[in-house]
Amino acid sequence: MVFSSNVFLFLFLPLFLGLYYLSPARYRNLLLLTASYVFYAWWRIDFLGLFAAVTVFNYWIGLRIGAAGVRTQSAQRWLTLGVVVDLCVLGYFKYANFGVDSLNAIITSFGVEPFVVTHILLPIGISFYVFESISYIIDVYRGDTPATRNLVDFAAFVAIFPHLIAGPVLRFRDLVDQFNHRTHTLDKFAEGCTRFMQGFIKKVFIADSLAPIADHCFALSDPTTGDAWLGALAYTAQLYFDFSGYSDMAIGLGLMIGFRFMENFNQPYISQSITEFWRRWHISLSTWLRDYLYISLGGNRGTTFQTYRNLILTMLLGGLWHGANWTFIIWGAWHGTWLAIERALRIDAAPKTIRPLRWVFAFLLVMVGWVIFRAENLDVAWRMYAAMFSFGDWTLSDLNKAQLTSLQIATLLLAYVVIAVYGIRQFYAQPLTGAPKAKANDQADAPQGIVHASSGTLAYSQAIDIPALATRVAVLLLFAASVLKLSAQSFSPFLYFQF
């Protein structure tokens, strides 16, 4: 089941919210767990057993680590067991096919018969719930959070359906207090509804309209320079609106039931370096990689060479996390290499006068990276790169022009206008001081995004805010249009579901 589907909007969500608010507070976590398992099993019920087994295993490992004591040798052994088992589960389901295919490519070149194995189906969301489980047992080992004895709360944390399929990558230590004591207010619910609609518009109205452009361009067997750059521009916008749209919807759903998740995007395309980009893009993953992988490898505590090695290795593994394909590994290496280069050149200390050039350069680096990220294989990636940097025919091919519509081109222009307007507003409103954190306090500032969702509602405002009222009306109208568009296409999967 996905958020952008009729069955979720018109059946699952209303039924769940009705039962949730009619239930006594002490039963709401259990109801949330049950609903999340139904949400997951809607895809394939046979993988629900694996999901539950991983959850129970890490709950038990957490108890063993907690009983052994913080950072003791016994706790370290339990932690090692937990991490190894988690990675083996992830490795088998996500990377076994890739490993066998890569091995077969090598041995067949020497005339050896290839291995024949049954294709292994990738369980949806496994990358997210395994990473969240690993972060929990590491936090227990480090003493950052106590081991919970409440299996229902822990299982609900791992399974909570707003973030289950494609993040954000949550941490138990950030949400444990909210599982025990969270408040439900009309203000918070209204904020959640606005945020959900905002994400829905991003996904259905913009990202889904851009998808055909990228698909057509990447499918061309002989793209022109114009085709290749159009495809890169379209996918760059599509991926942002698709993934940030999902994150907005997840955050909004969390607010509807009293949770406040961490922000996952902070206008990444205004970044002036790759380093800044990773402070703004997929923040929950980038901070996870920093806290649990980069620091564990040694971070910047060793020699200069070791620091650069740790940066590149972290991004290589981050690329591999996205998918079992050489394209993702190379994409990770691309970002890791530029992170190391920027650290060596002290890019953050560059003069302010060259900021526009830094922004253009950083955006081009990100977009070039998205090409291999989107490509189905290396052949497609090299074909796109060859067309992009041949700087030959800037016109679109006849096949591409025949498939493109005026509405698609208009949506692409609109997407970049939205990125520019809100990016500029964010740039001048406040400097980036670090990754946004999850906030449990009901008085926390409302999150920022394509539309600013005020924590107040019209019913309780002391004075009518005309711009805010106009924004809400626009959001409602666009949401209604997006629902009609969804009803026509019936199903709209998110790009990050494949990871």
UniProtKB/Swiss-Prot annotation:
A Pfam short name: MBOAT
InterPro entries for the chain: Ac/AlaTfrase_AlgI/DltB, AlgI, MB_O-acyltransferase, MBOAT_fam
Compartments, record wording: Cell inner membrane
GO cellular component annotations of the record: plasma membrane
Single GO biological process annotation from the record: alginic acid biosynthetic process
Function description: Together with AlgJ and AlgF, forms an inner membrane complex which probably interacts with the alginate polymerization-transport complex and adds acetyl groups at the O-2 and O-3 positions of mannuronate residues. Acetylation of alginate increases cyst resistance to desiccation.
Name listed for the protein in its UniProt record: Probable alginate O-acetylase AlgI
Taxonomic path: Bacteria, Pseudomonadati, Pseudomonadota, Gammaproteobacteria, Pseudomonadales
